[in-house]
Structures are given as C-alpha cells and as structure tokens.
Swiss-Prot record:
Subunit relationships: Part of the 30S ribosomal subunit. Contacts proteins S5 and S12.
The organism of origin for this protein: Rickettsia rickettsii (strain Sheila Smith)
Any single biological process term in GO: translation
Keyword Ribosomal protein: yes
Gene name in the database record: rpsH
Protein name: Small ribosomal subunit protein uS8
Record-stated family: Belongs to the universal ribosomal protein uS8 family.
Protein role: One of the primary rRNA binding proteins, it binds directly to 16S rRNA central domain where it helps coordinate assembly of the platform of the 30S subunit.
GO cellular component: ribonucleoprotein complex; ribosome
HAMAP family: Ribosomal_uS8_B (MF_01302_B)
PROSITE patterns: RIBOSOMAL_S8 (PS00053)
Gene3D superfamilies on file: 3.30.1370.30, 3.30.1490.10
InterPro entries, sorted: Ribosomal_uS8, Ribosomal_uS8_CS, Ribosomal_uS8_sf
Domain of life assignment: Bacteria
C-alpha cells in the first residue's frame, strides 16, 4: 500500500498512540520525519526517538512523553500543508499558536524548525504542522 502523505501518517500514528496511552510508536523513517522529530524533542513534546534498520527498511521508534499524572504532552497535532494544498507563510504572518503554548513546525531554507526559532532567524517557509 502506497502512502501519498508520509508526514500525515506519522502525525496520525503519534496522535493515536497518545490517545491509546502507549509508551512508544514506530513507523517507517525518512529525513523529513526525523527533522520534525528533532523539533518535537527540542520543544519537549517527545522523550526520545531512535532509528533502526530491519530487513533493509529504516524504522523510527518514538518514546512518548507523559506528565506525572499521566496526561499526554501533545493534546493536538495536525497537518497544515498537504500535498494537494501547500501552505506557505512569512514569519510576520505567524502569530503564536494557542497564545504561544503551542508551536508551528516550518520547513525553511535553513531546515525544519519551530516558529519560535524561525522568529529568531527571521525566516518563513512551508507550515508543515501545528502542535499543542
């Protein structure tokens, strides 16, 4: 079965794993997925992730993060820019998501980064997803 949107598949797997209270989730690996996971880890939404090779296919396993009382660190995670409709934004047009409690993840000429980092570097780009 071929997927047309690998990033949306990854986000859906993470969202469903949090709803099921799983400790970890795995999916096929790619460079863009790894870049998004780097941002999520840096922002404190996931614990860690590792990439493993199995039958010549790379898989990424993500260790999910929960609070002390068992609440998920990610309440919402949604794809913004889709293969059929790309969404680009200048940095001045990106306002804080959920009053700066959430983040946008952007693909910029300087790599994949959060909206906070993009504000510091004063660069816009494709809005991949939003996380709260």
């Amino acid at each position: 079965m071929s997927m047309t949107d690998n990033v949306a598949d990854m986000l859906t797997r993470i969202r469903n794993a949090y709803k099921s209270k799983l400790i970890s989730v795995s999916f096929p690996s790619s460079k863009i997925k790894t870049s998004i996971l780097d941002v999520l880890q840096k922002e404190g939404y996931i614990k860690d992730y590792i990439t493993t090779q199995k039958n010549n296919i790379s898989y990424t396993e993500v260790a999910l993060k929960y609070s002390v009382n068992g609440d998920a660190s990610i309440c919402e995670i949604h794809r913004v820019s889709k293969p059929g409709k790309r969404v680009y934004s200048a940095i001045k047009d990106l306002k804080g998501y959920y009053n700066n409690m959430g983040i946008y993840i952007l693909s910029t000429p300087y790599g994949v980064m959060s909206d906070r980092e993009a504000h510091i570097k004063n660069v816009g780009g494709e809005v991949i997803c939003k996380v709260f």
